[in-house]
A protein has these predicted regions:
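Conserved N-terminal beta1-alpha1 strand-loop-helix module at the mouth
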Residues: 1-85, 90-118, 134, 144-147, ...
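A short, flexible beta-alpha/helix-coil linker loop
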Residues: 125-127
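Glycine/threonine-rich flexible loop motifs
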Residues: 129-131
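Short alpha-helical segments enriched in small residues
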Residues: 136-139
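Short hydrophobic "strand-cap" motifs at the C-terminus of beta-strands
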Residues: 160
Length: 170
């Protein structure tokens, strides 16, 4: 599964970037605006949510369990220092998607055991979007982690962190 995580870069902001990837065929968008105010997040989130719905794409909000319902999002993605998955599940219920960030096999197993619907494993390589970056995994680290995790779980895992269009086969 290809998951687009919004990031202001060059001529694209969250809205134009979302529109571009949806027009290109992506059907999973995570709205990530780490330094935005709640009002900005709501404003941009409403537009991104409408775009996702018009393309029948999954719309995930990063970190903000409290805004999932207000934005009509399909779910939330939680970092390792965010609200625990089990607590988010109690708030959102079983119908919402909850993703969790992991950097190790132990993190992956903990996310699976706590009720996450998918795992974002990373970072793949160095990224400028995180201040306190976990150890970079690279392709070798991903292969090792996935081999060990697949012995325990079949939960979907997506690669995150520093991935560019050049990493995606045409």
């Amino acid at each position: 599964m290809l998951q687009f995580i919004t990031h202001c870069r060059g001529s694209h902001n969250e809205i134009s970037g979302t529109r571009a990837v949806l027009e290109g065929g992506c059907r999973w968008v995570q709205l990530r605006m780490k330094d935005a105010s709640e009002s900005e997040l709501l404003s941009v989130g409403r537009t991104v949510g409408e775009l996702c719905r018009s393309f029948d794409a999954v719309f995930i909000v990063d970190d903000h369990v409290d805004l999932v319902e207000a934005l009509g999002a399909d779910g939330v993605h939680l970092g390792k220092n965010d609200m625990p998955v089990a607590e988010a599940r109690k708030i959102l219920g079983e119908s919402k998607i909850i993703g969790a960030t992991a950097n190790t096999v132990a993190d992956m197993c903990a996310a699976a055991e706590s009720g996450a619907d998918y795992i974002g494993l990373g970072p793949f390589r160095f990224t400028t979007t995180k201040e306190r970056l976990s150890p970079v995994l690279g392709i070798g680290g991903y292969r090792e982690a996935m081999a060990a995790f697949r012995e325990k779980s079949d939960l979907p895992v997506v690669a995150i962190g520093g991935i560019t269009a050049a990493d995606i086969p045409a």
